[in-house]
């Protein structure tokens, strides 16, 4: 899945779109995506000017976006103005190594279960085959409140 198809499913746009390409997709089971981390990312200006590191919360957000793609593409639900994909929980988040400019962040999301419209995933971010972060994420799609 290239960036054009990703934009059909995710409502995120620059500077908060954190998935560049989907490398593998198994409907209802798993998705592997890629984020190319460059020095041009706006967060590196302040985090940290003399030693740029991608904020851990943004690594988790990238994982949540990969999980969203897994759910939305599995359900064949494209982004629209009537619904929103909510990040509703995170458990067991761990950060194992910093993510720096020049890294290719591999984002892996695997469905653990789905119940009453709430999806739970095992999520892992890797750089060069080494774990950068991992967590269990919970997300849901709901109608947008007016």
From Swiss-Prot:
Gene name, per UniProt, is fabZ
Please state where this protein is localized. Cytoplasm
**EC category name:** lyase
Q: What's the protein name?
A: 3-hydroxyacyl-[acyl-carrier-protein] dehydratase FabZ
Could you list this entry's UniProt keywords, alphabetically sorted. Answer: Cytoplasm, Lipid A biosynthesis, Lipid biosynthesis, Lipid metabolism, Lyase
Any single Pfam family the record assigns to this protein: FabA
Q: Name one GO cellular component term.
A: membrane
Q: Catalytic center at which residues?
A: 47
Please report the organism this UniProt entry assigns to the protein: Nitrosospira multiformis (strain ATCC 25196 / NCIMB 11849 / C 71)
Which GO annotations describe the biological process of this protein? fatty acid biosynthetic process; lipid A biosynthetic process
The record lists the catalysed reaction(s) as: a (3R)-hydroxyacyl-[ACP] = a (2E)-enoyl-[ACP] + H2O
Highest lineage ranks of the organism?
Answer: Bacteria, Pseudomonadati, Pseudomonadota, Betaproteobacteria, Nitrosomonadales
